[in-house]
Regions:
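Mature catalytic domains of secreted/periplasmic carbohydrate-active enzymes
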Residues: 1-197
Length: 197
């Protein structure tokens, strides 16, 4: 309903102070790949883009999931810290551009519950803690960039079509080093849409 969306947007704008958590497999290499820092590899030089900047193959990057076991993770402690600091909301990356989700999924096993030794649903735990501590909760889900399952294999076709009419093709965030074979429709209908339902 449009009125509810407008109210939610207004409420969010009035809150002004909150916590946005970027967290995923990219925290493991911490901005360094094969001894090279992000700043030396290229741009953007932010840790969550390491797979793109270092051109890490999908199968190599997926092995980081074997190391993802944040035993000190405590959703209540994080939420309480935010609340005590006067924050009004918490937003967390449920799935970033690497395609790894911090919650279980029936459509992709590349997530914290199924692909890691941690075996926990981080999103659910943070959501439940926000309810307990009366802090608004939101998620960020990268739907247009997914270096694991996105439609980056279609980039060459799109670029060739654009080149014929001298149109520019935007390659921002595109996995050109190890693209999946998925079409945009298959990625959207078989992963992105069902994963957020």
């Amino acid at each position: 309903d449009l009125r509810q969306k407008a109210k939610s947007l207004k409420d969010f704008q009035q809150q002004k102070f909150g916590l946005f958590i970027h967290w995923g497999l990219y925290a493991i290499p911490a901005g360094i790949w094969n001894g090279q820092k992000m700043e030396d590899l290229g741009s953007p030089s932010v840790a969550e883009w390491i797979q793109l900047v270092a051109k890490i193959p999908r199968s190599t990057y997926a092995k980081l999931a074997d190391q993802f076991s944040p035993q000190s993770f405590d959703a209540d402690k994080i939420v309480k810290m935010a609340k005590d600091a006067g924050m009004k909301y918490l937003v967390v990356t449920s799935k970033h551009h690497d395609g790894f989700a911090l919650y279980g999924s029936a459509v992709s096993s590349f997530n914290s519950k199924q692909a890691t030794p941690f075996k926990r649903d981080i999103i659910q735990e943070l959501y439940d803690a926000c309810l307990r501590h009366k802090l608004d909760f939101g998620i960020y889900y990268s739907q247009n960039i997914d270096w694991r399952d996105g439609s980056d294999g279609q980039y060459a076709v799109t670029k060739a079509q654009h080149d014929l009419v001298h149109a520019k093709t935007d390659a921002f965030g595109v996995n050109l080093w190890d693209p999946s074979e998925n079409s945009f429709a298959s990625y959207l209908n078989e992963k992105a849409i069902p994963q957020v339902k």
